[in-house]
UniProtKB/Swiss-Prot annotation:
Protein name (Swiss-Prot/TrEMBL): Cytosolic-abundant heat soluble protein 107838
Organism: Paramacrobiotus richtersi (Water bear)
Domain-related comment: CAHS proteins contain 2 repeats of 19-mer peptides designated as CAHS-motifs that comprise each two octapeptides connected by a tripeptide.
Key words of the record: Coiled coil, Cytoplasm, Repeat, Stress response
Keyword Transmembrane appears in the UniProt entry: no
Name of the gene: CAHS 107838
Miscellaneous section: Trehalose, a disaccharide essential for several organisms to survive drying, is detected at low levels or not at all in some tardigrade species, indicating that tardigrades possess potentially novel mechanisms for surviving desiccation involving tardigrade-specific intrinsically disordered proteins (TDPs).
Length: 229
């Protein structure tokens, strides 16, 4: 194998590997506050930090062209001179074009990703606003229902208290009627007994008189007879 052929093989195996560049997605925080009847929404875009992919061959050109390859060449052609990687303008230009194309594709993917994230975030925010508005309206309805419920309870309590007072007064009146009847019955059955004695003394004569009065209600007696019958 000639030296020119070996140089061609070495140039074909040589690969230009551009220095790896780490790409970080800046954290983008989007905050929108829209207040409609105490409705507040806050959007935070999740932080995504993905390292740029790095591709490399199993062996670099210098490893392929190092001492190990030199030993095999020396056995074939008995050439002991050291070999090194050679920079070829055509391959370097191709590598630069590939790197530029890779950068453009990555930037396009990143831009599309950001647009998709913003679109989904905006859709989610609008959905959350709709749900929050529904919840707010339902809570307002619940508040009105609570107010009506409390009014009903208070009115029921007042009405019940009035009924309790009416019952109490009605039975108190019955108790008073019974007491009046008892007093009247006691007066009707009561017997009046009086002893009367009069003594008159004068210079001419002395006079003494006496009497007894017993009084009993005839009305009570007749009522007792009716009750017994």
């Amino acid at each position: 194998m000639s030296a020119e052929a070996m140089n061609m093989n070495m140039n074909q195996d040589a690969v230009f590997i551009p220095p790896p560049e780490g790409e970080q997605y800046e954290r983008k925080e989007k905050q929108e506050i829209q207040q409609t009847s105490y409705l507040q929404s806050q959007v935070k875009v999740p932080l995504v930090n993905l390292p740029a992919p790095f591709f490399s061959t199993s062996f670099s050109a210098q490893e392929i062209l190092g001492e190990g390859f030199q030993a095999s060449i020396s056995r074939i052609s008995a050439v002991s001179e050291e070999l090194s990687s050679i920079e070829i303008p055509e391959l370097a230009e191709e590598a630069r074009r590939d790197f530029a194309a890779k950068t453009r594709e990555q930037e396009m993917l990143s831009a599309n990703y950001q647009k998709e994230v913003e679109r989904k975030t905006e859709a989610y925010r609008k959905q959350q606003e709709v749900e929050a508005d529904k919840i707010r309206k339902e809570l307002e309805k619940q508040h009105l229902r609570d107010v009506e419920f409390r009014k009903d309870i208070v009115e029921m309590a007042i009405e019940n208290q009035k009924k309790m007072i009416d019952v109490e007064s009605r039975y108190a009146k019955k108790d008073m009627d019974r007491e009046r009847v008892k007093v009247r019955m006691m007066l009707e059955q009561q017997k009046f007994h009086s002893d009367i004695q009069v003594n008159l003394d004068s210079s001419a004569a002395g006079t003494e008189t006496g009497g007894q009065v017993v009084s009993e209600s005839q009305k009570f007696t007749e009522r007792n007879r009716q009750i017994k019958q």
